[in-house]
């Protein structure tokens, strides 16, 4: 993993089993950053408690939002994300930053398990939009793990730079490390 991965935040998600239409035999479930297949715990953006990456700075903030909005977290899995400091658009890598109007102060978990890397579209340049590995079925063309994620940063970066994501959703594309975290 490159040293340029930045703590981006947390999300509680309802992990979906592999959809029948996804032609990727190794995939069992979807740990994507996007909410297209595995849904977030709530339609959280309207609560305005997210950070500049449109994720949450800590699990405690997710719990507080769920409590305030009477949303049950039962059945959700907790994920922590780190983002590569550059996004890919127009055939080159460019630096980007979190949305500055939101405070971003991510609490890095003491314990986490790397599940793989996801490539996520950010056409509007704020919140995660689509994960083409699951949303567009690219997991059927690229080597992914049981969670529909790429096995390494190098695989993700090379796949993006070589144009493997070009015919999916419009970019820019950002690379995220996806970690499982235990609810404590």
Model-predicted segments: where are they?
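Short aromatic-glycine-(Arg/Gly/Cys) micro-motifs in beta-strand/loop hairpins
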Residues: 2-52, 99-145, 171-179
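Short, mixed-charge low-complexity intrinsically disordered segments
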Residues: 49-103, 147-149, 155-184
């Amino acid at each position: 993993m490159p040293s340029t991965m930045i703590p981006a935040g947390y999300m509680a998600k309802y992990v979906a089993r592999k959809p029948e239409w996804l032609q990727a035999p190794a995939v069992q479930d979807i740990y994507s950053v996007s909410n297209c297949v595995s849904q977030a715990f709530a339609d959280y953006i309207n609560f305005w408690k997210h950070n500049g990456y449109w994720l949450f700075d800590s699990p405690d903030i997710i719990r507080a939002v769920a409590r305030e909005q009477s949303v049950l977290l039962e059945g959700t899995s907790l994920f922590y994300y780190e983002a590569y400091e550059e996004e890919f658009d127009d055939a080159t890598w460019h630096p980007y930053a979190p949305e500055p109007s939101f405070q971003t102060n991510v609490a890095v978990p003491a314990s986490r398990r790397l599940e793989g890397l996801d490539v996520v579209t950010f056409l509007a340049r704020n919140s995660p939009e689509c994960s083409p590995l699951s949303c567009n079925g690219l997991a059927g063309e690229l080597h992914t793990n049981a969670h529909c994620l790429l096995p390494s940063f190098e695989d993700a970066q090379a796949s993006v730079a070589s144009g493997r994501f070009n015919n999916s959703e419009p970019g820019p594309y950002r690379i995220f490390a996806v970690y499982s975290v235990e609810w404590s």
